[in-house]
Amino acid sequence: MIERIWSGQSRLYLLLLPLSWLYGAVTWLIRASYRLGLRSAWRSPVPVIIVGNLTAGGNGKTPVVIWLVEQLQQRGYRVGVVSRGYGGKSAVYPLLLSDNTTTAQAGDEPVLIFQRTGAPVAVSPKRADAIKALLQSHAVDFIITDDGLQHYALQRDFELVVIDGVRRFGNGWWLPAGPMREREGRLRSVDAAITNGGLAAEGEIPMQLVAREAVNLVTGQRQPAEQLQHVVAMAGIGHPPRFFATLNLLGIKPENEHAFADHQDYSLAQLSRLTSGPQILLMTEKDAVKCRAFALPNWWYLPVDAQLPSDRADKLLLNIQALSPDTK
């Protein structure tokens, strides 16, 4: 239902407009208070790159964070990542991730980024505290914040917005009548915009999510995803239909599809009921980090990588590298 409302297919959004105007007013006042100097924002001693969204829901932000970390690492830079840690609850903040950190403590996205990139990752509701903790333990050249475009208590050196190229900005209204955290005009003040799928508007950098080989959660075996048989697909991400569409593009026709809420916790009892007989369960990598501890032998996940045009990617990276006093 919420997708129909946000996409403009349902006029029920009209009932939510008073709340949206309130949300928009509060958001504007918060940002204005920092711009006018009424509230002070903390500045990191190393450059901060925000990777965020204008809209709620899955836009492909985490693959962009992973891509950016890996690209800077390949160029010889030391990169740290901070996050709010949505979906996790730690007894102590800030929390520096280790090999023993669980998604229940840190959230699924920080754990995924940590496992994929090997970069130091810290989480805290106050991102400045996360950065301070990270810098006390690691020497880094850049800090990348996973989300946080609207977290104006943190000064930033580069703002990168990720846009869903298919859904774009829906009906254009603020939450909850629409998907917007801030209005579309905010794009005029960011440093770069990456468009995930669909058609990129002028000035936006097009991006595609490219699937890798499927990986077995228990054995680590890799296999072309299109060779998997009797697939039951599941996705607990911001926009599950994107994962199911990726499978269709690979020629995979799942026998069943199960969409779960973003950041949802799973149990063995819950997921084991989704398959029977020769069926296998195929999930996103973000789901896999929450399931590996109790996975069954017929569970697989499908990693995806962000892919950008090389010329646009090089220009973006050069602009970011220029922020470092140690430009390589």
UniProtKB/Swiss-Prot annotation:
<dbReference type="GO" id="GO:0005524">
    <property type="term" value="F:ATP binding"/>
</dbReference>
<keyword id="KW-0444">Lipid biosynthesis</keyword>
<keyword id="KW-0418">Kinase</keyword>
<keyword id="KW-0443">Lipid metabolism</keyword>
<keyword id="KW-0067">ATP-binding</keyword>
<dbReference type="Pfam" id="PF02606">
    <property type="entry name" value="LpxK"/>
</dbReference>
<protein>
    <recommendedName>
        <fullName>Tetraacyldisaccharide 4'-kinase</fullName>
        <ecNumber>2.7.1.130</ecNumber>
    </recommendedName>
</protein>
<feature type="binding site">
    <location>
        <begin position="55"/>
        <end position="62"/>
    </location>
    <ligand>
        <name>ATP</name>
    </ligand>
</feature>
<keyword id="KW-0441">Lipid A biosynthesis</keyword>
<comment type="similarity">
    <text>Belongs to the LpxK family.</text>
</comment>
<dbReference type="InterPro" id="IPR003758">
    <property type="entry name" value="LpxK"/>
</dbReference>
<keyword id="KW-0808">Transferase</keyword>
<keyword id="KW-0547">Nucleotide-binding</keyword>
<dbReference type="GO" id="GO:0005886">
    <property type="term" value="C:plasma membrane"/>
</dbReference>
<dbReference type="GO" id="GO:0009029">
    <property type="term" value="F:tetraacyldisaccharide 4'-kinase activity"/>
</dbReference>
<comment type="function">
    <text>Transfers the gamma-phosphate of ATP to the 4'-position of a tetraacyldisaccharide 1-phosphate intermediate (termed DS-1-P) to form tetraacyldisaccharide 1,4'-bis-phosphate (lipid IVA).</text>
</comment>
<dbReference type="GO" id="GO:0009245">
    <property type="term" value="P:lipid A biosynthetic process"/>
</dbReference>
<dbReference type="GO" id="GO:0009244">
    <property type="term" value="P:lipopolysaccharide core region biosynthetic process"/>
</dbReference>
<comment type="pathway">
    <text>Glycolipid biosynthesis; lipid IV(A) biosynthesis; lipid IV(A) from (3R)-3-hydroxytetradecanoyl-[acyl-carrier-protein] and UDP-N-acetyl-alpha-D-glucosamine: step 6/6.</text>
</comment>
<dbReference type="InterPro" id="IPR027417">
    <property type="entry name" value="P-loop_NTPase"/>
</dbReference>
